[in-house]
Design a protein with these regions (language model features):
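His/Glu-rich zincin catalytic helix
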Residues: 1-83, 188-294, 333, 337, ...
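Charge-rich, well-structured scaffold segments of protease-associated domains
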Residues: 1-6, 25, 80-231, 267, ...
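Aromatic (phenylalanine/tyrosine) cluster motif
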Residues: 438, 448-449, 459-463
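Short, strongly patterned local motifs
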Residues: 451-454
């Protein structure tokens, strides 16, 4: 019998066993990647189109082309699509990124013939109806206006624009007027250019049967579909970074300020990227990170602060995120630079590095434990142009990095001079009163309430 009073032994995984997908090239040239895993009678189909923000001719074109696929086809109205998918217990997801559009179907195996029929119609014969498009645009405009009043939204988009510039797809800021320029013909032209059998790939994951594979081959692999079978050009853009060190966005009614600090970083194919991930995790990538331990736990300037690398084609964006009271903005930024100095000058203690290793290896194990998460991993690897050994290389980087390497990487890639500071909120001219450390604040509150409860008990005992 298991003795639950004894803590299980902690051990590092030697290597992660991540099965590779089986690849079949169908008659029309579409690659079909198959991950047959799991016991539940459910499958997920991901159809990827190489057509995102990088390829669009105007802002929002790629996003709304993808978003409108479910709003009506030659065979099904938007209501019929929603009703039938709900009836069969299926789920459809549509999303768009820098270079790709994703059309994802979750379906029970026993209803796969019915749901695949709807899926095929969505992919091959959308209508982009004007009425439905108008409703969606109005809804998105309202959401955009709501977001535009939030300090975190304003700070984030200002940072990306400051780092990449107006001529870069990442740095182009969407305005309210851009929504009004979207119409069915704009979406149809983007669809005709990029949504075709010569520009897509399919991933099939879950409890996959040969019957499911045959159905996909029949519907999507037997004949070419679409109008323009040219592969998209590989576009490259040069960031035009602003010379301003700090940008302030005034929000006079803001109760707190959003702070974003960022700069250009490595893309995922750089030889140092995997070890820089360890550095950034140590810096601000998990709850026990340097930024959290100092700025949240010790200083109490914020409820949460984090750092991470946002991946884009040909580059990455290192971002530090936090929200704080208006009077503590300067103190918070000062401590961020202090933590960078520590990483550049001091060696990381062995115990702290071991904790980061355990966190990152455990997170990797969770990321590859199901058929769908495996599909996500391989989609990420293939769309990023990474080698099949990426997972093995990532584990090796986490396990072998040394404190000396971390210090060298911090000196090379955490450059304080190029780190942009974006603050969105209310200007505060008075000096901040340094708050109690967060843990001490909690203890003080507990002691206060204990005294109150004790005094009440004493009071009632006398009377």
């Amino acid at each position: 019998m298991l003795d639950r009073t004894i803590q299980p032994r902690i051990c590092e995984p030697e290597q992660l066993a991540v099965p590779s997908p089986e690849c079949r090239v169908m008659k029309n040239g579409i690659p079909l990647y198959i991950l047959n895993a799991g016991d539940n009678e459910v499958v997920r189909i991901d159809l990827l189109i190489e057509g995102g923000r990088w390829q669009q001719n105007q802002r929002l074109q790629a996003l709304f082309t993808n978003r409108m696929l479910r709003e009506g086809t030659r065979r099904y109205s938007a209501a019929a699509i929603a009703e039938k998918l709900d009836y069969y217990g299926a789920w459809l997801e549509l999303s768009s990124s820098s270079e790709y559009a994703y059309i994802t179907l979750y379906s029970l195996n026993k209803y796969l013939p019915e749901t695949l029929d709807i899926f095929e119609s969505i992919v091959k014969e959308p209508l982009f109806p004007e009425k439905e498009l108008g409703v969606i645009i109005d809804s998105n405009i309202q959401q955009f206006l709501v977001n535009s009043s939030k300090v975190d939204f304003l700070a984030h988009r200002t940072l990306i624009n400051a780092v990449y510039g107006d001529t870069h797809p990442c740095g182009q800021l969407v305005q309210k007027e851009d929504y009004h320029l979207i119409n069915p013909s704009v979406l149809q032209s983007f669809y005709d250019r990029y949504y075709h059998s010569g520009n897509c790939s399919i991933y099939l994951a879950g409890k996959v049967s040969e019957d499911a594979i045959r159905r996909i081959e029949t519907l999507f692999g037997s004949e070419p579909f679409g109008k323009d079978f040219r592969k998209p050009e590989k576009l490259s853009y040069v960031p035009v970074t602003s010379s301003e060190k700090r940008i302030f966005i005034e929000r006079a009614d803001a109760m707190q300020s959003a702070v974003r600090m960022g700069m250009l970083s490595l893309d995922r194919r750089h030889p140092d990227y995997l070890k820089v991930r360890v550095l950034v995790t140590l810096f601000g990538g998990y709850f026990g990170s340097r930024l959290m331990s100092n700025i949240r736990e010790d200083k109490g300037y914020t409820y949460g602060i984090s750092a991470g690398i946002m991946p884009y084609p040909d580059s990455g964006l290192l971002v530090v995120n936090a929200e704080t009271a208006n009077e503590f903005v300067e103190l918070l930024i000062k401590e961020v630079y202090h933590e960078i100095d520590r990483l550049q000058n001091d060696l990381v203690p062995a115990e702290e590095l071991a904790m980061v290793r355990n966190y990152m290896l455990g997170d990797m194990c969770r990321s590859y434990e199901s058929a769908f998460s495996l599909a996500d991993a391989w989609i990420f690897i293939h769309t990023s142009g990474l080698p099949d050994s990426y997972v093995r290389d990532a584990v090796e980087a986490v396990k072998t990095i040394t404190p000396v390497e971390i210090r060298e990487l911090a000196s090379r890639y955490l450059c304080k001079e190029t780190l942009k500071e974006i603050v969105s909120g209310k200007k505060c001219h008075k000096k901040g009163v340094i708050p109690l450390p967060f843990s001490r604040l909690i203890v003080s509150l507990c002691k206060y309430y204990i005294r109150r409860v004790t005094s009440c008990c004493v009071y009632t005992s006398f009377y």
